[in-house]
Regions:
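C-terminal motif of bacterial Sec signal peptides marking the signal peptidase cleavage site
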Residues: 15-17
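Intrinsically disordered, low-complexity serine/threonine-rich segments
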Residues: 22-23, 99, 128
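Sec-dependent signal peptide recognition
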Residues: 2-10
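Bacterial lipoprotein signal-peptidase II cleavage site
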Residues: 19-28
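Mid-to-C-terminal functional-domain signal that highlights helix-capping/loop sites
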Residues: 27-95, 105-479
């Protein structure tokens, strides 16, 4: 762990590791579906969507197919079979990096990216940068991990043969607790996985003070208070942003300030157990039920791994070391993959405390102490200039950090509703109905219901995240 702490100090930046139905009672006043084209609401509200920039990464190099040559394989093993944090690399290892850079195989640049992520030695960084430029071209700084990885993502460069073994060697040399994640039978695309800047959260269940690990500390079964108790203090103001959850008639508010610190909650509400990850990097709070699973499967306890996939936090299950897709809720490695575990999602509403507590007067809310005295306000600070981790090519229909409410239709096709446009249209008296999905105000946020007023599961996120995990998504309103 000492190596990782040194890396954290050197980097000196606080990072966040980055269907339909439901249990809520039906909403009685479901709007009637509007007539005419669903994506062209009538009324006075003027839609003005902030579109994104198209980034020209140039022409992708051609990658070969098949196995690595014996010489390239030997060089690859040489640069990954030692302690990656050992400073400096030997001359033989530096020569091996140069040799791979002249191989003409762009697939090897993924390994350069992985090593560069943990590199503090200037000589090694230069060697990796020169080799990356030799493989991919000179139009960028090959020693810049972000610039290199953005191109690999945008170009969809294939991974080299045996990539999982090389990546396991690199990451486990930094933190041994990551090694079980690199399971050969898993379904992770390891190209997309990178270090989020923190170590793994392996706090025991129900022992989560948050002060005992150099990690993003989850909280289990958090202490809560009533609206009356909350209003006695001055911590929560009417404008405080919260994530609202209502299950079987029981409501709870999770202040964003706390979720920016904790990023993971394991809780019970309305008789249902669930895990609630919040990815600060992709603006996404989600609820995944962790009960009603197949016989023999114990309740999953979700934690933050310290890793990211395309700037989305990678969560894992504490007792089985099974990696989960945080955005999609399915197990990707380990015993829970073997069991075919797909968690059921529940709606989360982003609202202000004032509007949520007025609409849900019996709601509870997490207590201030869970924020550990921290107030990151990432949106106004760290993330004010856009994503801080590589995301590759993006869908330019919206700016990358515009909020959308993402929903998967019954036929499996995705659609995203631009949040600000939807709120503006609804406040102007318009109705929004697309394929039986009706968007309504909730607190001062939005949620989706069907034509009978039943909840349709959805969650909010930044556009770049939703559109990358759902590449063929529709967008409302149409651009």
């Amino acid at each position: 762990m000492g190596k990782l702490l040194a890396l954290l100090a050197a980097i000196a930046v606080v990072l966040a590791a980055c269907s339909s139905g439901g249990d809520d009672a039906a909403i009685a006043d479901a709007p009637e579906p509007e007539e005419g084209p669903a994506n062209e609401p009538e009324g006075e509200f003027e839609f003005n969507l902030p579109t994104g920039a198209v980034i020209d990464f140039g022409t992708a190099p051609v990658s070969p197919e098949g196995d690595l040559s014996p010489e390239n394989q030997a060089a690859l093993e040489l640069i990954t079979s030692t302690d990656i944090d050992e400073l400096p690399f030997t001359n033989e290892q530096i020569e091996a990096i140069g040799f791979l850079g002249e191989s003409g195989d762009p697939r090897l640049a993924w390994v350069f990216s992985d090593i560069l992520r943990f590199t503090r030695d200037a000589g090694r960084a230069v060697a990796l940068g020169d080799a990356s430029n030799a493989l991919l071209g000179d139009e960028f700084n090959g020693s810049d991990w972000g610039a290199l990885t953005d191109r690999l993502l945008a170009w969809d460069i294939p991974a080299p043969p045996g990539y999982i073994d090389a990546k396991r060697a690199i990451y486990s040399s930094i933190l041994s607790e990551w090694e079980p994640f690199f399971e050969p039978n898993g379904i992770v695309d390891w190209r997309f996985v990178s270090w989020g800047g923190v170590r793994i959260d392996d706090q025991p269940y129900n022992d989560t003070p948050g002060t005992t690990c150099n990690c993003i500390p989850a909280v289990d079964n958090p202490e809560v208070m009533t609206v009356a108790q909350a209003n006695e203090g001055d911590w929560l103001t009417p404008d405080t942003v919260i994530f609202g959850v209502e299950i079987n008639g029981e409501a709870r508010a999770y202040p964003r300030q706390i979720m920016e610190v904790r990023e993971m909650v394991n809780d019970t509400l309305g008789g249902r157990d669930f895990g609630m990850p919040y990815c600060t990097l992709c603006g996404s709070a989600q609820v995944w039920f962790t009960d009603n699973l197949p016989e023999g499967i114990e309740r999953p306890i979700l934690r933050t791994s310290g890793l990211l996939t395309r700037s989305n936090k990678v969560m894992y299950e504490l007792n089985t070391n099974s990696v989960f897709d945080t955005f999609l809720g399915n197990a990707l490695t380990g015993p829970l993959l073997e069991a075919g575990i797909q968690l059921e999602q529940h709606t989360v509403v982003t609202s202000s405390w004032g509007a949520w507590s007025e609409e849900h007067p019996d709601t509870t809310v997490l207590v201030e102490e869970l924020a550990l005295g921290r107030d990151f306000d990432f949106r106004a600070n760290r993330d004010a200039d856009g994503p801080i981790f590589p995301i590759g090519d993006v869908d330019p229909r919206l700016d990358v950090q515009e909020d959308v409410l993402g929903i998967i239709r019954e036929d499996g096709t995705p659609i995203a509703f631009h949040v600000n446009s939807a709120i503006g249209a609804l406040q102007a008296g318009q109705t929004i109905s697309v394929d039986g999905i009706n968007i309504v105000l909730s607190g001062d946020g939005i949620r989706a219901i069907d034509d009978d007023g039943n909840d349709i599961v959805g969650h909010q996120s930044f556009w770049f995240a939703w559109s990358q995990f759902n590449e063929d998504t529709d967008l409302w309103p149409e651009v």
